[in-house]
């Protein structure tokens, strides 16, 4: 004896498609990468580390040098989008999001050296962590509600 049941599986198939999108992760990690960029730009603007600690002021001699070269703006920033702040680059994939600085000297500023204080600009502050949590909660909520 053969019994066959037919069901409308379109709703279930849609859920699986949504789940596959989440499992791919690119939409979520793209949004997370955007938060990483926003955070770095904020830290450049506020001249502070992700922890909230203000960057150490520039040495007076170096300030004079920068001023003479026409760089009268904020620390680690040069007009026209050049320099460290303008070299930020993003990447993301199925299960990662990252940000970096294309300028070779970015690591020296991030970590500091014997002769230069650290001026960290990469990382997440409290706002960034909250925003990423909100992105994840929103994505999971949308997945379970549809």
From Swiss-Prot:
To phage Mu protein G. InterPro entries: Phage_virion_morphogenesis. This is Mu-like prophage FluMu G protein 1.
């Amino acid at each position: 004896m053969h019994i066959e049941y037919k069901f409308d599986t379109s709703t279930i198939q849609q859920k699986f498609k949504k789940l596959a999108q989440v499992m791919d992760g690119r939409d979520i990690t793209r949004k997370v990468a955007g938060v990483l960029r926003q955070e770095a730009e904020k830290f450049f603007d506020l001249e502070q580390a992700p922890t909230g600690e203000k960057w150490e002021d520039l040495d007076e001699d170096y300030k004079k040098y920068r001023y003479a070269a026409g760089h009268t703006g904020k620390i680690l920033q040069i007009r026209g989008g050049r320099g460290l702040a303008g070299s930020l680059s993003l990447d993301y994939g199925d299960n990662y999001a990252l940000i970096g600085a294309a300028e070779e000297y970015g690591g020296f500023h991030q970590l500091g050296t014997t002769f230069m204080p650290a001026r960290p600009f990469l990382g997440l502050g409290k706002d960034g962590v909250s925003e990423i949590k909100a992105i994840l909660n929103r994505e999971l909520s949308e997945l379970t509600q549809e």
